[in-house]
């Protein structure tokens, strides 16, 4: 993706710091971020709300639909998708103006950091989820491919929208449901305009190496022995010190 032509990009962020809430003597501060952008040459945009780093909802631009991160949120609040579409239209118009003023100068590409981990401790034969965490990148354009034993996987995959960071970079999560096995290894391959070639992170099952019972017993016995030796040596040194002091006191008394 690094060979793609110049990208012209503009982000529109509205950040609101909520009034401090006091509970007894505790001061609490929360942040709501409305993040939206329109991207060229992809001709697509995103509109979402973030609360303390977690997505509340985003708007599916193509379907003109509000998608809540948790269904329960829709029971307590509502958001008209048309409002987001109107904002994206304004962003597009502003972007056209900025392109002319900047002489089509592209924004800088910031390559992502990628980490792969499991959602919970892994046990063989028990379903789990792999998480591919893509962080600190810009612009918000990534291609992500899951691979099992080197072959692409398309079932059981999901992802979040692009999530804003305080430094105006982005982060994103991709998920893969899987059944842990000693025969399989998994890769999360990430392609971004800031990378010269796709970045691949590998995950494979690692068995926990436990000491055999006999070795554990030997280690415990050795530790106990060393501890007892230390105690005995300490007592001997103390007794010698007391004895030496008594001899000195007797000599001084005789004088």
UniProtKB/Swiss-Prot annotation:
Cite a single GO BP annotation. positive regulation of immune response
Domain Ig-like C1-type positions: 112-204
**For side Extracellular, which residue ranges?**
26-216
Signal peptide range: 1-25
The record gives the membrane topology as: Single-pass type I membrane protein
A Pfam family reported for this protein in Swiss-Prot or TrEMBL: MHC_II_alpha
One Gene Ontology cellular component: plasma membrane
For this protein, the parts annotated as crossing the membrane are: 217-242
Name the CDD domains for this protein. IgC1_MHC_II_alpha_I-EK
Which parts of the sequence are annotated with region: Alpha-2? Answer: 110-203
Task: Enumerate the subcellular locations listed in this protein's record, separating them with semicolons.
Answer: Membrane
Residues carrying a glycan = 143
Q: Where is the region Alpha-1?
A: 26-109
Q: Which domain of life is it from?
A: Eukaryota
Q: Which family does it belong to?
A: Belongs to the MHC class II family.
Quote the protein name from its UniProt record: H-2 class II histocompatibility antigen, E-D alpha chain
Q: What species is this protein from?
A: Mus musculus (Mouse)
């Amino acid at each position: 993706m690094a060979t793609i032509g110049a990208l012209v990009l503009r982000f529109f962020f509205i950040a609101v710091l909520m009034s401090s809430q006091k509970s007894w003597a505790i001061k609490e501060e929360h942040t709501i971020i409305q993040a939206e952008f329109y991207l060229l040459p992809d001709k697509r945009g995103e509109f979402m709300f973030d609360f303390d780093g977690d997505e509340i909802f985003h708007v599916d631009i193509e379907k003109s639909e509000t998608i809540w991160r948790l269904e329960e949120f829709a029971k307590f609040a509502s958001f008209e998708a048309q409002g987001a579409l109107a904002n994206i239209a304004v962003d597009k118009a502003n972007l056209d103006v900025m392109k002319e003023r900047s002489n089509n100068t592209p924004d800088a590409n910031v390559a992502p950091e990628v980490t792969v981990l499991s959602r919970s401790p892994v046990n063989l034969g028990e379903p789990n989820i792999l998480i591919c965490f893509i962080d600190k990148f810009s612009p918000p354009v990534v291609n992500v491919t899951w691979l099992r034993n080197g072959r692409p996987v398309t079932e059981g995959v999901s992802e979040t929208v692009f999530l804003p960071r305080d430094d105006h970079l982005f982060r994103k999560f991709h998920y893969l449901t899987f059944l842990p096995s000693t025969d399989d290894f998994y890769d999360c391959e990430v392609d971004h305009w800031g990378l010269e070639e796709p970045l691949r992170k590998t995950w494979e099952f690692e068995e926990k190496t436990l000491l055999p019972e006999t070795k554990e017993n030997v280690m415990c016995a050795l530790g106990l022995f060393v501890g007892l030796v230390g105690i005995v040596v300490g007592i001997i040194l103390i007794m010698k010190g007391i004895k030496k002091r008594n001899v000195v006191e007797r000599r001084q008394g005789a004088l």
